[in-house]
Amino acid sequence: EHSFPTRRSSDLIVYSLYTKPYKNSTDLIKKLKSQNLKIINEQFAEKILSKISYFRFKIYLKPFLDTTTKQFKPNSTFEYAYELYSFDEDLKSILFLIIGQIEINLRTKLDQYITSHTNNSFWYLDNKYFINESKIFNTKVSLKNEFLRSKDDFTLHYKENDVNNICNDFKEMPPFWIISELSTFGNILSIFETIDKKPFTLQHNKNVLDELSKEFGANNLKELNSWLKLIRDVRNRVAHHSRVWNCNYREPHGIRQILSSDLNPTQTNKIYLFFVILEILYKNQIVDKNIQQEIKILLNNYPKTRDFIASMEIPQKWLD
């Protein structure tokens, strides 16, 4: 074993050379059994561990592990952990479809509200509508790069025939309704975060951007932006095939305050509040999947997961 001292203020951190050996599926099963994990079907377990890396799978074993003794709790099985894994995989598939619907709605309504108010289909290129010019510039560069790379028929047609007179640095760029088809969720979030509310003021203390936010069930733009950040975080975990079901997340604004006491979570940093946002979006016809029903179906398909709904902070009444 080798130690490598490093400097940090007056402290020394000692690192050890990583020496853990490779273990194949058979070795891993022996290891798990030595930790008191029951494996009902070893052939099945070997097959799973040959398709899913142990490093990835072991996070689903963690709820069954006694962290003090490093032994698995009584009656814990490999199959129960795989049930948790399968629940999470199916949940991600559902969320992928729902978030896709949200994303399409965001692009569409953003363009409808702003273009109709400004009468300018190239509004996203005009700095007068934004409060953070450097951030929106980076977004425009990102969109430009994507547009120039695109070989889609609709982009090729525009590039061969049209330009705009709104912004010389981006004169080859198309109207928002075209570029939005190439935008990432991050691009859209950047626009929502940097857009200036002042040019969108209406009579009677109303604002175009707040009215847009109400389409999604939020009270105002600030609240919607908070939701979008959480949606972005979940979307990124789904897109990278990361664990979703019991992770820590940011708390969205305005959600806990509208829930009755028996529907309020103890911890506000779990996925349940994200599910509540999806409920609101369903009621506002932004998405066509009822997340509450989808979760009930998943729990019926994977009944062992019911033992861990507290890890998602889902109140029992929400499932009744």
Place the predicted regions along the sequence by residue.
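Short, small-residue-biased leader/transition segments that mark boundaries at the very start
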Residues: 2-9
